[in-house]
Amino acid sequence: MTDRDRQPEDTTAPTGEPVVSKPYIMPDDPEPGSVELLQKEAAEARDRMLRTLAEMENLRKRTTKEVADARLYGITGFARDVLDIADNLQRALDAVPAEARAAADPGLTSLIEGVELTERSLLNALEKHGVKKFDPQGQKFDPNFQQAMFEVPDASVPAGTVVQVMQAGYTIGERVLRPALVGVAKGGAKAASAANSNEVN
């Protein structure tokens, strides 16, 4: 091949003519009513989107509440089991009469103090985890927090007043873990005044 047969490479600069692309062809006029149809579809899509956003927000709130409840109330079963231990410690202390405590030798006194400290420590540990003891002695009977075991005829207190607590109650958060077992006054001030008015007549 000779130099003549070779084609010279095109080393010239582009000529400055713009590159022309194919023109955009507008579609035919839209069908009558298609604008309204598109607006309706857009409104429906917007409505679905807003509903989905609301559902997601409700789900987020519900999940946050469930996580908080799980943290607070997750130990409910364990706490109920531990309450039996607290009750047994209290029963052990109640089994020793006050006279025996006063006349007790140092060994028995140390044992009683040890049981008291153990009970106090157990109740403090429960309280750290949201379990609180309540003693409704002298309060008006509330069936949401107490379970009436018997009625006591006592005219010195108003009817429906808790006069004896057989077993203390416990709450966890805002829920009742175990209701207090109580004795409730029957009759009382209102019943006594009604009985007096009957005697006068």
Curated annotation (Swiss-Prot):
Upper taxonomic lineage: Bacteria, Pseudomonadati, Pseudomonadota, Alphaproteobacteria, Hyphomicrobiales
Protein family (similarity comment): Belongs to the GrpE family.
Name listed for the protein in its UniProt record: Protein GrpE
KW Chaperone (keyword) present: yes
Subcellular location as annotated: Cytoplasm
Gene3D superfamilies: 3.90.20.20, Head domain of nucleotide exchange factor GrpE
Location, primary (coarse class): cytoplasm
GO molecular function: adenyl-nucleotide exchange factor activity; protein homodimerization activity; protein-folding chaperone binding; unfolded protein binding
GO annotation, biological process: protein folding
Function: Participates actively in the response to hyperosmotic and heat shock by preventing the aggregation of stress-denatured proteins, in association with DnaK and GrpE. It is the nucleotide exchange factor for DnaK and may function as a thermosensor. Unfolded proteins bind initially to DnaJ; upon interaction with the DnaJ-bound protein, DnaK hydrolyzes its bound ATP, resulting in the formation of a stable complex. GrpE releases ADP from DnaK; ATP binding to DnaK triggers the release of the substrate protein, thus completing the reaction cycle.
Location of region: Disordered: 1-32
Gene for this chain: grpE
Keywords: Chaperone, Cytoplasm, Stress response
Subunit structure: Homodimer.
Pfam families linked: GrpE
Any one cellular-component term (Gene Ontology): cytoplasm
Positions of disulphide bridges: none
InterPro entries tied to this protein: GrpE, GrpE_coiled_coil, GrpE_head
